[in-house]
Amino acid sequence: MTFTVDITPKTPTGVIDETKQFTATPSGQTGGGTITYAWSVDNVPQDGAEATFSYVLKGPAGQKTIKVVATNTLSEGGPETAEATTTITVKNKTQTTTLAVTPASPAAGVIGTPVQFTAALASQPDGASATYQWYVDDSQVGGETNSTFSYTPTTSGVKRIKCVAQVTATDYDALSVTSNEVSLTVNKKTMNPQVTLTPPSINVQQDASATFTANVTGAPEEAQITYSWKKDSSPVEGSTNVYTVDTSSVGSQTIEVTATVTAADYNPVTVTKTGNVTVTAKVAPEPEGELPYVHPLPHRSSAYIWCGWWVMDEIQKMTEEGKDWKTDDPDSKYYLHRYTLQKMMKDYPEVDVQESRNGYIIHKTALETGIIYTYP
């Protein structure tokens, strides 16, 4: 019978650093001899001469040939030899690497302000290396391949941040590991505009022209500004930054402007400012020259003056044109006489003005209305 040897197990598989045991089983040997065994892996001799061989699997991964040569040494005659081989498939180890992104609960961010994130591996093999990919809302961020990520948000809302690492290590299968997902709340930017009024307050005579101009500072360059105005807490017309004050009545007013400032990437802001208005009665400008003499009539609490009809005509014409005959048109050649009449009306409870056309006596009531010859 021919001397043979067999190896078990047949075509096994294992993982690097795992120990596999092989057993050589002889048959057909001549009796009375001593059998020894020589083991080799890929033709590299291994220690031990026993029928069992424990082999710690080494990298790199792939197939390795296990060979045993059995020698039966006899007391008489030459030795008998037999050999056998088998193939073992060696696989890489499996990683247990994990990946975490910090901060896991970041503070709210602001559009345009960078937020820093860091990805850290854990339980990775010694000597492992990694490349990184960062994602915002499931879209990969180009050019970001490091373990740190500086994210500058461009829109507001809740952003989902995560990292994927490709981890490689000797004797291990490559691993793609995904981190925890971090939620980052991004707020719009805050602005601090101010509104002022020019002038800060107004003090004018009745019917004089007066305007407030609203000026907004501290707003972004691209900001849109809308205006609204109030007079004594009641809305009035006007949507620009200029407001024309109603000076038709003597008294005081409080004018308030509200400016609403909006800009892309900013929270809108509404700012207000108030200005005080004082409207005083018109004061007739004092003319050059000597005023006509007014005759006091103390027994009647009145005063008398003669006045040319041409002055009366001018008073009535100005009234019909909507002018104030007491103060308007100070360059008129009859202004000296009109000034005298209005002063006389202030100085005396009643007046007796005799016009020259008909000799009529005109009293204060008619002069106040400005209708001398044609009564309404």
Curated annotation (Swiss-Prot):
InterPro entries: HOC, Ig-like_dom, Ig-like_dom_sf, Ig-like_fold, PKD/Chitinase_dom, PKD_dom, PKD_dom_sf. One of its GO terms (cellular component) is viral capsid, decoration. Keywords: Capsid protein, Virion. Residues 355-359 are annotated as: Interaction with the major capsid protein. SUPFAM superfamilies: Immunoglobulin, PKD domain. Capsid decoration protein that binds as a monomer at the center of each major capsid protein hexamer once maturation and expension of the capsid has occured. It only has a marginal effect on head stability. Dispensable for the head morphogenesis and phage infection. This is Highly immunogenic outer capsid protein. It comes from Enterobacteria phage T4. The lineage of its organism: Viruses, Duplodnaviria, Heunggongvirae, Uroviricota, Caudoviricetes.
